[in-house]
Structure formats: C-alpha cells, structure tokens
Amino acid sequence: MIDIIKNALKEAEIKTWRINEKKEHTAEVFFIRRRQDMRRIRDTHKYNVEVFCDYEKDGKPMRGRSQVTIVPSQSEQEVLTLLKEAKHAASFAGNPYYELPEKQACEPIAAAGSLAEVSAEEAAKRFAAALFAADNDPRAFVNSAEIFSKQVKTRILGDNGTDVCYYKNDVDGEFVVQCKEPEDVEVYHSFGYDNLNCDALREKVTTALREVADRAIARAELPSGTYNLILSGENAAEVLSYYIARSSAGMVYPGYSTWKVGTDVQPEMKDGERLNMTLRAKVPFSSEAIPMKDRSVIADGKVETLHGGARMSYYLGIEPTGDYSAYSCENGSISFEEMKKEPYLYAVAFSDFQMDTMSGHFGGEIRLAYLFDGERVRIVTGGSVNGSINACSGGMRLCFPASALRVRLPSRNK
C-alpha cells in the first residue's frame, strides 16, 4: 500500500508529503458486574497522508497543509482522487512558510517494558483480574468495566527520505463504581498504562470504591469561605498542566503567553515550593518524525524549555521538540500526612474540574470532599471551588510520595 500511495503522490505532482502508518492489534473485554459480557479482537490498519503546497501570497512564501486517511481496501484510483483533493485543499489552507523536520531514519524500534513481554490478550486478562481483585468493598461494587489492550506499529515516511518505525504497547479502559445505600451513586473512572502495572489499577479501584461509598453518605454542608485546598491525581495534573501549556510554542508565538526561557513562573514566592517539571517522551518519534526525549520544562520555578511542533517552533526560531502528551512533577518536601495536619478541604471528585490555560483560573463543582476543621473530618458534597494559579503559585506545596498539591482558595456553597 505504501508503494500505491507513493505512486499516487507522484502522479498528483505532490512534491512534499508525509505518511503516518498505524497498524493496531487490540484485545477488548467488556464486563457487566463481574460477568464478561463481550470479548473481541480488533485489527485496524490505516495511513494518514499529509500533503503540503508551497506558493506565494502578496509576495510572501506560504505553505499549505491538508491530510487524508487511506485504508488498504481502497483502490489505486480512489487513493489518487483523495490525494488530488487534498492537494487542492492545501492550496487554500496556507500559513507563513515554515520548514519541516530534518530527515530521520532508523531500524524498527521494538516495544519496551513489561507489556511487551505478553500478548495483548494476556495483558487484558491480567488487568481484568487486577480490577476485580479489588472489588471486595461491602459498601460498593464495580458496576461495569471496559479494557482495551493495544499493540501498535507506527511508521513515518517523508519525501525527504525520512523512514522511522517503532512499536508500542499500552492498556487503557474505564470502569463505573456504584454504591446503592443510603443514596444510589455511580462514579465513572478511566485509566491508562504503558506497562504491566496491575497493582496501580488495583489500588485505583480500591480508592474508587471507598470514595463512592463516602459519596453516598456525604452531606451538603460545606460552608462558604477560604480553605487550604488539597488536590491529587487527575485534578492536581489538571492544575499543573497550566505550566505545560504556557511554555508551549503554540501559546508563545501568537502572544497568548509571554513566557520565554528564564521566565520566573512563580514570581511572588511566599511559603510555597519551587516547581520542577519534566516533559516525558512516551514514544521515540512525534507524528512529524521529530526525535522525542525527556526534557526539563520548568526548573526551580523558571522556564527551561519552550516546546512544540515544527511550524510554531520555526516561527519562534527554536528547536522543534515535538508535541508531548505526558509530564511529571518532582515530589515536594512534606509528606501527605504532614500536609493534612492543618485544616484543609481535600476535594477528590468534581462534576467538572477545569483549568483555563489562557487566564490561569481553575475550579469546579464538588462531588466529594473531606473537610478537616482542626478537630474532625467531615465528608461533604456540593458547593464549588475556584481560584487563580497565578495568585496562589507562590504558596503552593507539593507532597511525597503521593501526587498532591495544596493551595489556599475560596469555596462557595451554592
């Protein structure tokens, strides 16, 4: 099929192009309670073809881009027609000219990690066993679950001779936990792992069952006021994603962010801790065939790397790093238990928690929180929290070993 696409590109007189081939083998398992409802194997194979069109507009060089998806079942004529349409579309979708990444070539890179040691079917089986091994809370149960175990081959080719290939395995899915008494409550959770970390899923389910049982007895008695807010897991990650977004070339070039290398992102330090954050490479190459590696993005509260794909990086005059999907933040200097010695509001579940990376404001409506007033812990629901990362970053505390952060924020009871 690669040869068919290349021949069609030549016939369509498309000189600049990139092909991204994806071949996936997926084992899917679906459960209702503990009963396996359905099991299936799914194989998909597709080619995402990007075509580029260079031209001038008002005397300035432009580069247009368009893309189409091709599957092996399509005929040579169908492929040619799609590519001609993409070429035509690219001539109307121009941006100021930018250079594409340099040529990359390598031997196929085998999948690494513990997931590569077992089949997709076996991985799905083990994660299912781990998920239901935790389903032993007398107050709550796993209502339903879905597990998807994938083995993916990615190959990227370009007109400049680029030809890289790598394999990657991962497991993701979702489950719903339910508690029926004294109030019927259901809570949705998702998960994703790139190693055979069954213990992590088991712990996640155990926590989810405990929290849904607490949600069923939670009371809407959160007073309005200002609290030491503790966030963990996905909620903490959502807040910290602000720093990843603001240091991206896609935010800096249009002027949405004024950050540059060396910018202090915590200019008003009080009793908080300096951030140290790292972009984590989950694959060896980006979709543009840019080599990916771990990069320090925030070091001691200052920007160390601006990051992004080829186009925005070219406009800024920086090295293209590729687009990252994961990051880590170094642990803080206090333990989670120390963090909870002072009065706090530990919000563990929201109906919708969001971070606005343009303004730095974040917040959401509370579904479940633990309120400690200095003497006792109450399980509460209702109300909302909102705040600005810019206003509280100087007092942010991070803990170890759990991924949690504490800031001081106002809460409002509706």
Report residues per predicted region.
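Acidic low-complexity segments
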Residues: I5-N7, K15-E28, E76-Y166, T206-E234
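Structured beta-strand/loop patches that form or line metal/cofactor-binding pockets in enzymes
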Residues: K15-N48, S144-V164, P343-I366
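Dual-mode signal for accessory low-complexity, basic/Gly-rich regions
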Residues: T263-K414
